[in-house]
Amino acid sequence: RQRRRRIKARRRIKRWRRRRIERRRWIEHATADR
């Protein structure tokens, strides 16, 4: 049971990493505008 949960968490992390990169660029643009 734990091994399957770890695999699911790893797949979620990969998707979060792509969204985090996009959010980081958005935050950088907002700070540069300030």
From Swiss-Prot:
This is Unknown protein 5. It comes from Pseudotsuga menziesii (Douglas-fir).
